[in-house]
Amino acid sequence: GVWFEEEYKRVYPNGSLAADVIGFSRADNEGQYGLEEYYNDVLNGTTGREYGYLNDDANLERTIKPAVDGNTIHSTIDANIQGIVEKYLKQFNEEHKDAVHPGNGAENVGCIIMEVNTGNILAMASYPTYDLNDTRNTDALLGSRKIEMVTNANGYDVLTKTDTYFTQEDIDALTDDELLDNLNYLWKNYCISTTYEPGSTAKPFTVAAALESGAITGNEHYQCNGSLEVGGHTIKCHSYRSGGEGDVSVQDSIAWSCNVALMKIAA
């Protein structure tokens, strides 16, 4: 005889919301990227089975092994805050699209919002992003820089950004491997998978350490002429071209992100 069996799979009712954080599951229900991959064994249940045979009286003898549901996980992401962040990341890119170069307003934009008293992550988003229910939709690549596999000076194959900003014609010309390379770059969580030096985010800690150690009182003022010689190198402030910030208080050094004042504080 013929009978129907239910099939279970994970779906995403909110589409692209928190795509970087959530990740997605493949056709075989294996998680890929994000929470889906990290907690795959927790989220995946056990598939039920039904089998049987016809006995001597031609009656069907059935055996049913019921499915076991996977577990539920709760993240600290606030869907309302996440939605607002994603809205404005997209708005920024639409406003600046094609302004400096063809394509998106920025190659990547990321934003993390944290609850400072607990460390809970309330929102984590980047742009461009994608729909979790349609992960291979190439519309998400439009305006992004093309990624190519190249061999570096050490003989290693590495993914490198080209000077090409995707048009539909560029996407249509990709081989299957090239398309997968570019989709994999899109699917990763930009906020936590791409490394940069901490830069100005370290400045509040420099001032805090100076205050706590007694190296400064907080009432000092520093003169910024736009650059400072340190160890035989000229380190510039963002105000270098305009001749520097001039008189900078400790508070202003953070508010204006003044490199010269911070170097003098750290010294």
Segments (PLM) and residue ranges:
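Active-site SXXK
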Residues: V21, I84-Y88, T118-G119, T195-Y222, ...
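Sec-exported extracytoplasmic/periplasmic mature domains
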Residues: R26, N44, E86, K90-E94, ...
